[in-house]
Amino acid sequence: MKYKIDAIFPTPIYIASLGREFSKTEIKAMDKINKSIHKNESNYISDDSYILEKPVFKKLKKELFTHLLEYNKVITQWKNVKPYITQSWLNFTKTDEYHHIHEHPNSMISGVLYVNANPENDMIRFFNNCYKRIKPETKNWIFMGSEYCHGLFN
């Protein structure tokens, strides 16, 4: 399993690649989900907030969970806490759109999987009085503590 740890504020951020292409079935399912979306502040979010429960994403969820356990083991080192996935959704952000700054106060770990990132323009920014930008690549996982405000910009 290949990944790197990037420390900001000095909080480590876990970045790893999916390590494979998205299957045609997964892409088709994402395209279908893109037809059931609603407006967010400046982009769109899927109506379904449990997409990883769909059978088509079973393999993806398993791969994600493997990295989630690794993050928990290496970064948090919580001995008596077993992480689990509560919600999962898709955000659709076009050129000149962004994903608003937010946090996930009801979670301990949050993550983003980039399905189609433009490394020249796309970035995730983390805020804590100052901010840190990370340029994602397509198929990157990015896990962070849920208390960190973050937004996606291009």
Which sequence ranges carry the predicted segments?
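Non-heme Fe(II)/2-oxoglutarate
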Residues: 1-81
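A residue-level signal for beta-strand positions that form part of recognition/binding surfaces
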Residues: 13, 87, 123
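A short glycine-rich, His/Asp/Glu-containing loop-to-beta-strand
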Residues: 83-91
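Catalytic core of non-heme Fe(II) oxygenases with the double-stranded beta-helix
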Residues: 91-154
